[in-house]
């Protein structure tokens, strides 16, 4: 396991001969570790501290071509789990079954599906959509200002005309 142990007592972690807690690693080292994985695991504890996390590891592992198994963290389940991109498991038996399923997936079709999904959710695409929304709001505001200014002129002209008609 790579990464810090936080919000859980290290003594509560499972201890087995094939489980190694390596702590945090420099980002430059991570691809070397990832290259040796058959399946990427996201075994987050499910508690109030993890209820609203959105692990960036999920798209990173998917982009690296690894099948992923995660506990049912809300931002992993939706969209990755519901989209069939990540296997979701919460019990030891579910994790074993999910890992076996991940190992038996057709790698080529999984990668095609993942690539298509990630292309729709890239930072460039997200920023482009945000910029469009901002521009739409600004354009609406400009149109509204023009309309209000035009209405103001119309009201002023009507007031002037009314003064002439009524003699006020």
Locations of the language-model features?
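Short, hydrophobic beta-strand segments that form beta-sheet elements in well-ordered domains
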Residues: 1-6, 68-71
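Nucleotide-activated donor-binding/catalytic signature segment of Leloir-type glycosyltransferases, i.e.
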Residues: 3, 8-34
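Nucleotide-sugar-dependent
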Residues: 26-33, 40-63, 69-81
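CheY-like receiver
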Residues: 33, 98-101, 129, 133
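Conserved acidic donor-binding segment of nucleotide-sugar-dependent glycosyltransferases
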Residues: 85-93, 100-106
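A charged, aromatic-enriched C-terminal amphipathic alpha-helix characteristic of glycosyltransferases
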Residues: 107-137, 142-143
